[in-house]
Amino acid sequence: MATKIRLKRMGKKFYAVYRVVVMDSRTKRDGRAIEEIGLYNPNTQPSTIEIKSDRAQYWLGVGAQPTDQVLNLLKITGDWQKFKGLKGAEGTLKTAAAKPEAAVLVEEAENKAQKLKAAKAEAAAKAAEAETPAEVQHDDEKVELADVEESAPESV
């Protein structure tokens, strides 16, 4: 039986997700698979490629032929180089940066909020400090005006 390692289309319209499967070469594209050995999602950044290396090595070893698209995926993951005994068996797969945990994000947001509150309080304190001498000067002027009015003779 001639077997192929190829892609089986899954997902919605305009959002294709593929499974890397081993099938008889005469079956339909989305027909029954002998074994599913991986997943390929080209919609994420970077594309998600998950292939079970040991199963891919087994099927390549027993003569399964990869399609061109699957061959490119196997080269990216390094499975093809490992099978052929070539250099670069680690592949060129780039992993996405790890996302920080939710607790770390919450803690950073709280620290940022506390810094903002402290800055606002400090600005308010400086503004209050700047206003206080000005008010005192105005009060002195009012007191002086009141003294002048009291000492002035009453006009009839």
From Swiss-Prot:
Residues 136-145 have a biased composition (Basic and acidic residues). Residues 124-156 are annotated as: Disordered. One of its GO terms (cellular component) is small ribosomal subunit. It comes from the Bacteria. Residues 146-156 have a biased composition (Acidic residues). One of its GO terms (biological process) is translation. Transmembrane segments: none annotated. Residues 124-135 have a biased composition (Low complexity). Belongs to the bacterial ribosomal protein bS16 family. HAMAP family: Ribosomal_bS16. This is Small ribosomal subunit protein bS16.
